[in-house]
Amino acid sequence: MTQAIHAQNISYPNSLKGNVSDTYFGKEIKDPYRWLEDDLSEETKAWVLEQNKVAFGHLEKIPFRQDIVRRLTAMWNYERISAPFKKGKNTYFYKNNGLQNQSVLYKKTKKGEEVFLDPNTFSKDGTTSLAGLNFSKSGKFCAYQISVAGSDWRKVILIDTKTKAILEDTLIDVKFSGISWFKDEGFYYSSYDRPKGSELSEKTDQHKLYYHKLGTKQKDDVLIFGGNDAQKRRYVSGSVSKDMKYLFISAANSTSGNELYFKDLSKKDSPIVAIVANFENDHYILDTRKGKFYIVTNKNAPNKKIVITDAANPNPENWKDFIAETNQVLSPSTGSGFIFAHYMIDAVSAVKQYDYNGKLVREIKLPGVGTASGFGGEDKDKELYFSFTNYVTPGTIYSFNPKTGENKIYQRPKVQF
């Protein structure tokens, strides 16, 4: 039956060949299908429509297609709940009833739970998705990003977490950006200048970091980094330390290797200071404590390590190893006043718990042989959460007591297989 389907002759629509070419280093390179790069043209839309007719016409002839649909639906149709996380006085978690296109964000209440944000209501056709979400320091405000039809150009919408009222501070044309709040006053975000042509094919190579103050217009946002040729970078991001004292800036021209800068937010008009001023390695700030920076780096450590340095002398020559490199790749997280070092050893998770003096507190006993992720949270959290799964265990959420090292099941999915 399958062979008969494959043996059918498929008549594909004609794809027009153009006469476009470029010359690089004296050699002509033909590009006959460049017209398809214009995703907004009527010609491209018509071409996609005809291609879809052929593809779906072929797929609809598969005799066992509905059997596959029924089996996959049965396997996917079970409730999934994420690990809870606290923001301010509220506790949130994501839940999917099994067949929802996007998980719904819930807030715990005295009576149980309530829907806080449902991405499935963003559009009637389901093509608008939740692309990011961040809460302000006290949890009073939430900024979330939406993406339409998978576009990297996003809109940032702000809401009051108590009333769920949408604020007037909606931002547009935000691309490749996180949101990092400074207290409840505003936040840092990144974007490019809006391209004049197609958003899918026009060049964007100068990322800029901005600060948006609540209650102001986007056009009045303050440019922090990336506004001149000396600061021209393809990717720029900003993150505020947990104590709200420092802004850290990562700048890169590719997906490997980045510069690292910081700005003291406790001092008015403080300069941007370089920590690393080259693209030779990857670095990011894990945490800060009492003027000390905890940096994750692969400088002289391909499997990554954590170093500690002083804000007064942050350059690499002053770095000291905090958690040294091992034979396994390091993936750290922080929570409850501890640092958790996650390693994969022969495809099996191993997690170690350290205090901020670098002392090993314990090697965490996991529920079994498998993959664990999580252990992140705020310093004041008295319990943390992690997920665990293996070949015979669907993703299960555990609560973890950082003082005793004990863990227990928080939520186990009920599957039908």
Q: Which residue stretches match the model-derived regions?
A:
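Bacterial Sec-dependent N-terminal signal peptides
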Residues: M1-N9
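Charged, compositionally biased N-terminal leader segments and the immediate start
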Residues: Q8-E28
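Peripheral, non-catalytic segments that deliver or gate enzyme domains
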Residues: N14, E28-F417
